[in-house]
Amino acid sequence: MQKARIRLSGTNPATLDEICNQVRGIAQRTGVHMAGPIPLPTKRLVVPCRKSPDGEGSATWDHWEMRVHKRLIDLDADERALRQLMRIQVPKNVNIEIVLES
């Protein structure tokens, strides 16, 4: 049987967990085997920049960062489950990637 590997990524871990709960609910309603959500390592993007706009004075720096959280879900690829999965309302700041594997 085919499996669907769902990879979620976003900057807000609460919205990722909310979508994972929706996927878990779909798996329970349709009776499909689900593994996960597996939290993957968080990627931390740091951008250092000078506070002073003109370059004069002491070298003081601001450090801006963005954290990208990821989750991985394995789901048996049942047609009913995948149709319901496509109807989930995904926020703009969450990236969802579905790969079918045999």
From Swiss-Prot:
Protein name: Small ribosomal subunit protein uS10
Domain of life: Archaea
One Gene Ontology cellular component annotation held by this UniProt entry: small ribosomal subunit
InterPro entries named in the record: Ribosomal_uS10, Ribosomal_uS10_CS, Ribosomal_uS10_dom, Ribosomal_uS10_dom_sf, Ribosomal_uS10_euk/arc
Any one GO biological process: translation
PROSITE patterns the UniProt entry points to: RIBOSOMAL_S10 (PS00361)
Pfam family, one: Ribosomal_S10
Annotated family: Belongs to the universal ribosomal protein uS10 family.
Cysteine-cysteine disulfides: none
Subunit structure comment from the entry: Part of the 30S ribosomal subunit.
Keywords, in A-Z order: Ribonucleoprotein, Ribosomal protein
SMART domains: Ribosomal_S10
GO MF entries: structural constituent of ribosome; tRNA binding
Role this protein plays: Involved in the binding of tRNA to the ribosomes.
